[in-house]
A protein has these predicted regions:
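Short, low-to-moderate order helix/coil transition modules at the start of elongated helical scaffolds
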Residues: 1-66, 156-176, 180-193
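Charged, alpha-helical coiled-coil and adjacent rod-like segments in eukaryotic scaffold subunits
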Residues: 96-193
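Extended, amphipathic alpha-helical coiled-coil scaffold segments used for oligomerization/tethering
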Residues: 2-10, 31-135
């Protein structure tokens, strides 16, 4: 049974990491949409700061610029809505991995044993640790760093460490140097558990 649990855990972690490219793509597209927003907003301020004399042709210029700005905002809104939907789908997958035993059962892959990293793990402890990480999947850098700092300080939960490292593939808010330090401790087997 323990070997089976280790295989499930290994398979699940591989699945988490496989989502990284999708997450990066969504973030990139969202950033592109935000750039459209920023450019449209800059254009709006530029237009509003101009003092046009009230001649027909200059009013037409102002209206044309406003129309262009509004079109940019509408396009950015649409793109952001699409990206938000993509992100929510990823988050649902993320939480599904944490909470549905059936998903683990369907993800079993015959991976070799990962040594000390998996020896103390059970399905229950893995799911509990991953669920805790899923609940902290928030857009708050300080909150993420606080979690990392706490785990680095206590060094008492290797399974939670493994899960957090996997979760980072979906959450780019954690500082990379903190992640590297934490992963190093796990690989050196310097965490308890």
């Amino acid at each position: 049974m323990q070997v089976e649990v280790q295989k499930r855990a290994r398979s699940a972690c591989t699945t988490f990491k496989a989502l990284k490219s999708e997450w990066d793509e969504v973030r990139g597209e969202a950033q592109d949409a935000m750039t459209v927003f920023a450019n449209a907003n800059l254009e709006l301020r530029t237009v509003d700061d101009l003092s046009f004399p009230e001649t027909l042709s200059e009013v037409d210029v102002r209206e044309a610029l406003r129309a262009k700005r509004n079109a940019a905002f509408e396009a950015a809104d649409k793109r952001l809505d699409e990206r938000r939907a993509d992100v929510e789908e990823i988050r649902r997958d993320f939480e599904k991995l944490a909470n549905v035993e059936k998903y683990f059962a369907s993800s079993i892959v015959d991976y070799p044993d990962d040594g000390a990293l998996f020896r103390t793990m059970t399905f229950k402890s893995f799911r509990r640790a991953f669920s805790a990480v899923a609940q902290t999947f928030v857009d708050d850098l300080k909150a993420k760093e606080k979690i990392m700092d706490k785990l680095l300080a206590t060094k008492d939960d290797r399974s939670a460490a493994l899960v957090l490292i996997s979760a980072f593939a979906l959450d780019p808010l954690i500082e990379q140097d903190l992640l590297d330090e934490f992963e190093s401790l796990v690989l050196k087997n310097e965490l308890g558990g």
